[in-house]
Swiss-Prot record:
Pfam families assigned: Band_7
SUPFAM superfamilies per the UniProt record, alphabetical: Band 7/SPFH domain (SSF117892)
InterPro entries xref list: Band7/mec-2_domain (IPR050710), Band_7 (IPR001107), Band_7/SPFH_dom_sf (IPR036013)
Lipidation (N-myristoyl glycine): 2
Organism: Arabidopsis thaliana (Mouse-ear cress)
Topological category with respect to the lipid bilayer: Lipid-anchor
Domain of life: Eukaryota
Keyword Transferase: no
Keywords: Cell membrane, Lipoprotein, Membrane, Myristate
PANTHER family from the UniProt entry: HYPERSENSITIVE-INDUCED RESPONSE PROTEIN 4, STOMATIN-LIKE PROTEIN 2, MITOCHONDRIAL
Protein's name according to its UniProt entry: Hypersensitive-induced response protein 4
Coiled-coil stretches noted in the UniProt entry, renumbered to this chain: none
One GO cellular component term: plasmodesma
Amino acid sequence: MGNTYCILGGCIEQASVGVVERWGRFEHIAEPGCHFFNPLAGQWLAGVLSTRIKSLDVKIETKTKDNVFVQLVCSIQYRVVKASADDAFYELQNPKEQIQAYVFDVVRALVPMMTLDALFEQKGEVAKSVLEELEKVMGAYGYSIEHILMVDIIPDPSVRKAMNEINAAQRLQLASVYKGEAEKILQVKRAEAEAEAKYLGGVGVARQRQAITDGLRENILNFSDKVEGTSAKEVMDLIMITQYFDTIRDLGNSSKNTTVFLPHGPGHVRDISDQIRNGMMEAAASTQVNDV
């Protein structure tokens, strides 16, 4: 609902003040409510001012220290000071233009001393400087500056494209570093695993051979004790032949073996046969001697 008034009286709504004149001269500030005026005494309501907070967006184009053209968007929130409403009513005809002019002046004095990166980092300082300057100037005209926000900093499109490319290149470089470190760690862990596997495999082979050696020793001793007249070498030869045939049998039973290299010459077969025959004859001879 707006303010309504006539020559004899008027109603001033909440968050507003009226400027009352007498014979064309300022007399007093009228608070919200219903007021009566005496036109015969030259009293009348000259105008009404709102004390609500108003917002003004200002766009400023300027250049940074590193020769980059940017556009800054400032949002200024201001209001009329109730106690100084007469100054706001009489002193300034267009407060928005006055505010814009001072914002332009301050921003264009500060930004050329900053690089683009510094401007992004210190935009709060720029807003603070604008606020301090406006408070000093506009306070004399009955206006209070509530807040100033540096809403946006918009570089030239070509500069933005270059900044995005630089950012992308830096991220790719960082990603390659992380990837290299990950591959390095993976290779180190793989090498450690292989070394550990070889170590454990060696330990297993050593234990296996130790067990075989212990078993052969025990077999030789048992055979020598039970069969008189046999030497340890003869028992060892017999065991080796037995293991030879066991190995051939295992190779033949395995489905995964495709090629087996065996001694195939007549001499090798004869040697094996002689060893078996001699072993059996010696065993039989020792048995007869024991019977006699």
